[in-house]
Design a protein with these regions (language model features):
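Radical SAM/AdoMet-radical enzyme domain recognition
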Residues: 1, 36-38, 51, 55-148
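Canonical Radical SAM [4Fe-4S] cluster-binding loop centered on the CxxxCxxC motif
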Residues: 1-23
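Glycine-rich, proline-tolerant flexible connector loops at the mouths of alpha/beta enzymes
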Residues: 8-12, 42-51, 114, 186-190
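Short glycine-enriched, charge-decorated loop/helix-capping segments at active-site entrances
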Residues: 15-18, 118-124, 193-196
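Short, acidic/polar
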Residues: 21-30, 87-95, 163, 227
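Short Fe-S-cluster ligation motifs
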Residues: 26-44
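Conserved C-terminal portion of the radical SAM core fold
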Residues: 43, 65, 98-109, 128-190, ...
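Acidic, glycine-rich active-site loops and adjacent beta-strand->loop/helix elements
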Residues: 45-46, 76-78, 152
């Protein structure tokens, strides 16, 4: 994605890193004596991270510490692995649920409008696919969050369209718990030539989100983006 400041492609692969299942479990075990209630897992779309990998990971976490709530992966990752492993969204999400998935984070939404999404996040699942995977998860009884990346090349109409699609799905499923506006940060990415929006614009965006998404219980301020 053009707004990403941490991904590393093949030419700079040595600067990147990836965890094995055992390494992830070592991280989980490092919190054994601490009052942790949730493990939050997100990552990239790498070939070795397939359906089997995550099924085994979720099962391992639950076997080690059954009370931990697993909030894991966005539709971007699910779309990639389900397509690669030739399983439907419904089949794939049921496999994840049976393995121990408790909820989904809200990442990967960016902006749903194709004319913007194709420019900033080409190659990711579409906005419609993002919404479809969340709807399937909600229909399985699962809960999830939603996000919107703002302050880049989109305009107000794109933001309103994004909020409207979330609101309509929430009216249908009531499966979203929290909406998280994500402010575009321009350091170390392909959109560094863009200025960041003002704090006043941030406040306006939060206010409009709270008013319009009256069917969402929570609006969250994400400190790495807004702090």
């Amino acid at each position: 994605c053009t707004f990403c400041s941490y991904s590393r492609l093949i030419k700079k692969r040595s600067e990147g890193w990836e965890y094995t299942l055992d390494e992830i479990m070592d991280i989980v075990r490092s919190f054994d004596n601490k009052p942790v209630t949730e493990v939050h897992i997100v990552g990239g779309v790498l070939p070795q991270y397939d359906v089997k990998f995550y099924v085994n990971l979720f099962k391992a976490i639950k076997a080690h510490r059954p009370e931990l709530h697993i909030k894991a992966l966005t539709p971007v990752e699910y779309h990639y692995m389900f397509k690669k492993d030739k399983v439907s969204y419904a089949e794939g999400m049921k496999l994840m649920q049976d393995a121990g998935l408790d909820s989904m984070p809200g990442g990967g939404a960016e902006i749903f409008a194709p004319e913007i999404r194709d420019q900033i996040a080409g190659g990711k699942c579409s906005g419609d696919q993002w919404l479809e995977i969340h709807e399937i998860w909600h229909n399985l009884g699962g809960k999830s969050n939603a996000t919107m990346l703002y302050g880049h090349i989109e305009n107000y109409s794109h933001r309103v369209d994004h909020l409207d699609q979330l609101r309509r799905l929430q009216d249908k499923t009531n499966g979203f718990q929290t909406f998280i506006p994500l402010k575009f940060r321009n350091e170390n990415n392909q959109l560094s030539h863009l200025s960041e929006v003002s704090v006043v614009e941030d406040l306006r965006n939060y206010a409009i989100s709270r008013i319009y998404l009256d069917n969402f219980d929570h609006i969250k301020s994400y400190w790495p983006m807004i702090g």
